[in-house]
Amino acid sequence: MVFYRSVSLLSKLRSRAVQQSNVSNSVRWLQVQTSSGLDLRSELVQELIPEQQDRLKKIKSDMKGSIGNITVDMVLGGMRGMTGLLWKPHYLDPDEGIRFRGLSIPECQKVLPAAKPGGEPLPEGLLWLLLTGKVPSKEQVNSIVSGIAESGIISLIIMYTTIDALPVTAHPMTQFATGVMALQVQSEFQKAYEKGIHKSKYWEPTYEDSMNLIAQVPLVAAYVYRRMYKNGDTIPKDESLDYGANFAHMLGFSSSEMHELLMRLYVTIHSDHEGGNVSAHTGHLVASALSDPYLSFAAALNGLAGPLHGLANQEVLLWIKSVVEECGENISKEQLKDYVWKTLNSGKVVPGFGHGVLRKTVPRYTCQREFAMKHLPEDPLFQLVSKLYEVFLLFLQNLAKLKPWPNVDAHSGVLLNYYGLTEARYYTVLFGVSRALGICSQLIWDRALGLPLERPKSVTMEWLENQCKKA
């Protein structure tokens, strides 16, 4: 199924300078390419993929050096800090946070097209950036919006029927992942592979599957929400709306804040976070076996559903509400510190704080905080989150084993709750819809670059003991 309308317009690339600040606050300039062609697929075919294929060949032939040492701590510590993945769209800096094709979140907010001046970036614009490395024009974004609106309904009836076979009480992520699996019957990659497509062309049906999947996951997610919480009364998509606004609309939220600001912001900042996190890595790993994007993304969703990954945004709001129930909304910072210690001493974590890579407060948190300060400064739960942030930084940041930096989950639940999406068990589904943009972008590049099957080596405890004796 062809997802985007072909528009044979390609013109010269132009570039413009976008100012960036690095960790030391000195100024540097990044050349951000833009283009006026409206066909995203043509952009990839005619220039970007051949260029990046040649670049990878050069790296393979010319650069044989080592990029780091593997320690026992890395092997026993979940491979944390071990460099071992090529990830095209993003880089996660421990101090600056995520960069989408070199652009920080504040920079994306400035240069990516919005629905109206001063609004949050349209997710379609981020998708163009992730796939091409170029900042799109509003016309290019509109072409993607139109493509999403024109996406067919193949397999949606199968998806609805499959989800309905589950108990309505099943966890939202169980229903969401099941629905995505049901969409797999329309896979263009599977059909092409069975017909013997040459491996150099693998990326083409992967592109079709990925774009159709991105278009359809909000339909799956909205169906799950309306089935669970609104008596199955579904709302059809509005083809005049963009990706984020349409998703909010199908959920049942019509406020401009939910459309214009919160959902677009949410989808953008949750789209990806480098390749080593559980969901992104799982999608890449499964796809390396030439599983199609539907199978790969469904696997990624199952990883996202874990409490140490995407389920954390659900756990944050539940934990905050437990604080209110036990201590009241007007809890002091000292009382809150005691409650944090109570949680930690019981062998649990405080959800929303600490990260495997990040070493400071980063834009994914601060942009949500700024949004809350502008739109809901008096909300009791937001004020409690603010106190919690201060408690971690003022009282707890000097503890050797504690990583106090807030992550993206620390704020999102409070914002969603304020605007009426109060069902915390559903929050990870929102995360999953967002993650489709980043994971599918990478899957297209995985196949375009011909990346191999992932197959690391494992060792036994005896092997490790012998290695330690030799050291």
Swiss-Prot record:
EC number(s) from the headed UniProt entry: 2.3.3.16
Coiled coil: none
Subcellular location as annotated: Mitochondrion matrix
GO terms assigned for molecular function: citrate (Si)-synthase activity
InterPro entries assigned to the protein according to its UniProt record, in alphabetical order: Citrate_synth-like_lrg_a-sub, Citrate_synth-like_sm_a-sub, Citrate_synthase, Citrate_synthase_AS, Citrate_synthase_euk, Citrate_synthase_sf
Active-site residue list: H309, H355, D409
Note: Citrate synthase is found in nearly all cells capable of oxidative metabolism.
Classification via NCBIfam families: cit_synth_euk, PRK09569.1
Protein name (record): Citrate synthase, mitochondrial
Organism: Solanum tuberosum
